[in-house]
């Protein structure tokens, strides 16, 4: 189960517009439905809840892995921040839009807590 506020929060954590969510998460380009979910007018599709929860899990795994490296003093506590998808894919050639958004969300979170510097 997920409510409208949780849906909005996750969209914002991943820095995605409603339009991007309808392209890359629902894959139906139906902004009106997403807006109705965020307004609490209709129940959120279980498939969409599952996709968002999986994105959240992947994000947390990345955060945990980086924090473990920091705690073990591996690396220099600097993380790349990619301004666009093409720059992300130049390094992570198998990465897609969703992977980029997860990566960026992790980078921003760790930077906000002074755990990583961005480069």
What are these regions (language model features)?
Residues 26-44:
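Recognition helix of helix-turn-helix/homeodomain-like DNA-binding domains
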Residues 5, 15-17, 29:
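Residue-level signal for the short linker/turn that defines the boundary of a DNA-recognition helix
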Residues 8, 19-20:
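Residues within the helices of the helix-turn-helix
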Residues 1-13:
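A short, Lys/Arg-rich alpha-helix, primarily the initiator
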Residues 20, 44-62:
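DNA major-groove recognition helix of helix-turn-helix/homeodomain DNA-binding modules
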Residues 61-119:
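Helix-turn-helix/homeodomain-like alpha-helical modules used for DNA recognition
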Residues 11, 22-23:
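The alpha-helix within a helix-turn-helix
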